[in-house]
């Protein structure tokens, strides 16, 4: 969670740091952590390899959605077009291949708030990216997620919906989409 604030501070106060070490850090992040095409996974410096084997696609999806929403969206909103925006867009487009279908997430996360957190983060991201790009595919994807919660599912009848802590991301996401 500290990463975007280091980059934003350097962007505002130290262009040499921003264009030097922090840009290098972005390139190293991509080089070391990309595990499923461009999607990142947790890298262990002591092992000089990924932290977990075998691959846990649920963790990869969760981490990528977190990185986009908490790490890259704040940078994009202040800086605009940059290598960080390019990273955000490639991650988002790659995620679409893995989480466009809701049953996919359920196979990784049983009875946890992770599905709501991921979908909420995606709604927040997709709404903002739609405004940034004007590309209808991002709005359509967001609407599909929202329809799942507001039309396809009777939330009063489901066995488990956790809206506290991280699961509440869905509320913010639905709100942002409503304004979009």
What are these regions (language model features)?
Residues 1-180:
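Glycan-recognition and catalytic cores of secretory/periplasmic carbohydrate-active enzymes
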